[in-house]
């Protein structure tokens, strides 16, 4: 929740995110005021991750992808905009990084084709997921929140396919965006960034496993 929202511009710190998760409170004494949507989208991210785990045995579908978006954007200022279409595909054209994305009237067809391509893959690898993610972000199916939805899908599909999951933290942010931007010319940059993030995530797992084992020894 912290990393994915952080690279999208959330001003919540890691400690603040942990505080919200553990206490469900939003008061931060003697600290900078935080936009309400940052709070809402962070708490929504916790719910979205629970949904991710609850549906982990189901094949990826447009229904699941749309539900990620609905959960993430419910209660935000965007949800009050009549054109925003929370939990469904965009009604207005948008762009990412100065590049045009899929036209609204073409999104449903393009998402169907993307889903069919992905489900036809017999051996999903980190390369498959990189291509899926790039295609998804090129379509940019939602009015906003595409990056967060796309990264939740990446994490989910890593778990489903026995691949080390990862999060794109602030240190990987620029490499990640460059990898998406240059994917047509070279797939290696995005894949390499994802693999680097996997190494970080694996080191977290090892650290917490060691802490857990040390705790059990003390007990």
What are these regions, as identified by a protein language model?
Residues 1-144, 148-219:
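FIC/Doc superfamily catalytic core
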